[in-house]
Amino acid sequence: MQIFVKTLTGKTIALEVESSDTIENVKAKIQDKEGIPPDQQRLIFAGKQLEDGRTLADYNIQKESTLHLVLRLRGGMQIFVKTLTGKTIALEVESSDTIENVKAKIQDKEGIPPDQQRLIFAGKQLEDGRTLADYNIQKESTLHLVLRLRGGMQIFVKTLTGKTIALEVESSDTIENVKAKIQDKEGIPPDQQRLIFAGKQLEDGRTLADYNIQKESTLHLVLRLRGGMQIFVKTLTGKTIALEVESSDTIENVKAKIQDKEGIPPDQQRLIFAGKQLEDGRTLADYNIQKESTLHLVLRLRGGVMEPTLEALAKKYNWEKKVCRRCYARLPVRASNCRKKACGHCSNLRMKKKLR
C-alpha cells in the first residue's frame, strides 16, 4: 500500500509499504529517498511517536495515511518544569519531543501519571501530539505543571440574558479551556467572551485554581463587542475625558483606563451614572451604558476631608438659594414669592446664609 510522510518543511514523501513493515523498515525507506539517517528520524502518527520495533499494523496505519517526520536534534537541550508547589524539575529534551514524551519524562522523575498532568507554556495548555518546536519552546524555557484532578467539578456560567450554563471542569483548567467549553455548548467564539468572577475579569492563561474558583461557583459571561465604543467621563472641575471601552468592560476596567489617562488611583474614584454609584464588579452593559454616555467622576474623600472641588460645589449650592422668612422654605435665587400655600406665597424672603 502507499502511505505519505510529511516533513516540518511541508514536503510530502510517498512510500510503498506493507502493514507488516516495522517502523524501523519505514525509516530505512525514508533514508533511501531522502538520505536522513534513521537515528535522526522521529515518526509521529495520531499524536504518538512510533517505536522502531512496532509495525504499521500495530498503529492501525492504513493506505494513504500520513505520518509526520521530525528530526532528532543532536545533543538536545535542557528545559525546566515548575509545579504549583514551587518545585522545579530539570529535563533533558529535544525540540522534536512531543508533549506526550515530556509527560513521560516527568513520570519517570516524579511518578505522576501523564493523564494527571497538564503542561502550560506562555499561557497555553500544551497538546499531547504537538512538539516542543511547535510551541517555540527553546533551551532553558520553563513550563508550568498543574495536576488534573480526578472527577473534576461542576461550575455555572451566567449570561447577561439570565441563562445559566453548567460546565464540567477541573481546577487545573485554564480560562482558555473554559471558553472553549462554552464555545462547544453555545457557539460563542472565545475571542468574544469575557468571564468575570468576584468582580475581576479572568485572564486566558490562568487556571480556575488561580482564582480560587471551586465547585458550584458562578462565573458571569459578557460578550466582547467588536470595535467597542466611546464614552465620556466628566469631573467636578468640568473637564471631560473620552474613553474607548466595550460594553463588557467592568467598572474596575474603566477606572483603570481613567488612571492611565489622569493618574487618579481607582480606590479614589467614584463613578456615577443616572444617579447611581457604579460597582466595580459590574459591567457597563449591566448599567445600560451605551456609546457616548457620560459618567460623572467624583473623588473618594480621604479621612473625611472635603476635596476643594466638592467644597466649592457645596458653597455654590448653598449661596444660590433664598429662604422664606415665614415657613423657611428654600427657594431658587430668582424667586420673588414663596411657592408654599401655608404662608400665603409670602414675598418676605432673604438670601440663605453662606457656608463658611
UniProtKB/Swiss-Prot annotation:
Glycyl lysine isopeptide (Lys-Gly) (interchain with G-Cter in ubiquitin) cross-link, chain position(s): 48
Cross-referenced InterPro entries: Ribosomal_eL40_dom, Ribosomal_eL40_sf, Ribosomal_zn-bd, Ubiquitin-like_dom, Ubiquitin-like_domsf, Ubiquitin_CS, Ubiquitin_dom, Ubiquitin_ubiquitin-like
Coiled coil: none
CDD domains referenced in this protein's UniProt entry, alphabetically: Ubl_ubiquitin
Glycyl lysine isopeptide (Gly-Lys) (interchain with K-? in acceptor proteins) crosslink location in chain: 76
GO biological process: translation
Residue ranges annotated for the Ubiquitin-like domain, each copy included: 1-76, 77-152, 153-228, 229-304
Entries under PROSITE patterns matching the protein: UBIQUITIN_1 (PS00299), UBIQUITIN_2 (PS50053)
One GO cellular component term noted in the UniProt record for this chain: ribonucleoprotein complex
Record has Lyase as a keyword: no
Keywords annotated in UniProt: Cytoplasm, Isopeptide bond, Nucleus, Repeat, Ribonucleoprotein, Ribosomal protein, Ubl conjugation
Pfam families, sorted: Ribosomal_L40e, ubiquitin
PANTHER family: UBIQUITIN
Something else known: Ubiquitin is synthesized as a polyubiquitin precursor with 5 or 6 exact head to tail repeats. Some ubiquitin genes contain a single copy of ubiquitin fused to a ribosomal protein. This gene is an exception, since it contains for 4 copies of the ubiquitin fused to the ribosomal protein eL40. For a better understanding, features related to ubiquitin are only indicated for the first chain.
Family designation: In the N-terminal section; belongs to the ubiquitin family.
The name this protein goes by in its record: Ubiquitin-ribosomal protein eL40 fusion protein
